[in-house]
Amino acid sequence: MNILDQLAEYSRLRVAEDKKKISLEEMKNIAIQTKNEKLCDFAFEKALKKDDLSFICECKKASPSKGLIEPDFRYLEIAREYEAAGADCISVLTEPKWFLGSDEYLKEIAKMVSIPCIRKDFTVDEYQIYQAKTLGAAAVLLICSILSEVQLGEYIKICDSLGISALVEIHNEKEAGMAVRAGARIIGVNNRNLKDFTVDTANSRKLRDLIHDDIIFVSESGVKSTDDIRAIREIGADAVLIGETLMRADDKKAKLDELRLS
């Protein structure tokens, strides 16, 4: 079982435990009644629809490939730095075992900042989408590798009903077709293969032509330099998601400024 399969399986266990505390129907009702006073519906995708490249900046304490990244995880301070530096959106890891994430991180960050947040987790059940809405998320991550096409289509519809966005993650040509058929409006190419952790930034270039221009295109992972940003701009990407590079920067605002202005 590769790491992605392990992450998905652990998500199923987490959901089963969460349902013992709050049932699916209860969570649905809470989500439907949850209103975001600061953001409009579909604020995440609206933030990515601009003439220039949009930046999704990630808050994460650890990862399976790199281990502990930020021992002193000042997540609120980091989110504040990102917003001050001009980030368009913030990605918050909530997966607790391998990424040392927490729902509370998302809840507190979403409450503090005025830009949209995406819940970065391994969605395997509709429960997690309703849960994300209650935590203040403006978007959720849906990974094609761990979902069927039917599930993907259903989950996108649930997101639509809640006024939140779905970032649909793909890794290859087959998943690109799956995402388009399911009705994805935002498609992200993960340049990191979560099955073996190899990184290939050319993956975004390879898959770009398979995605219609009316779909928001996001390049995820492996972005380290201004050269990487220039390459992403050249293929006509709408947005880039940056995690480890910013998390390891001593001055996150300066690093983001450098990348944004490249």
Mark where each language-model region is.
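N-terminal active-site wall of soluble small-molecule enzyme domains
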Residues: 59, 66-167, 173-179, 204-207
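An N-cap/entry alpha-helix motif that binds or orients negatively charged groups
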Residues: 2-70
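C-terminal helical cap(s) of enzyme catalytic domains, especially alpha/beta-barrels
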Residues: 206-210, 233, 248-262
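Glycine-rich phosphate-binding active-site loops on the catalytic face of alpha/beta enzymes
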Residues: 131-150, 188-197, 235-255
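Conserved, mostly hydrophobic/aromatic
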Residues: 7, 57, 82, 132, ...
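Active-site beta-loop-alpha junctions enriched in small/polar residues
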Residues: 10, 60-62, 95, 122, ...
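Catalytic cores of alpha/beta
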Residues: 124-135, 173-182, 219, 223-242
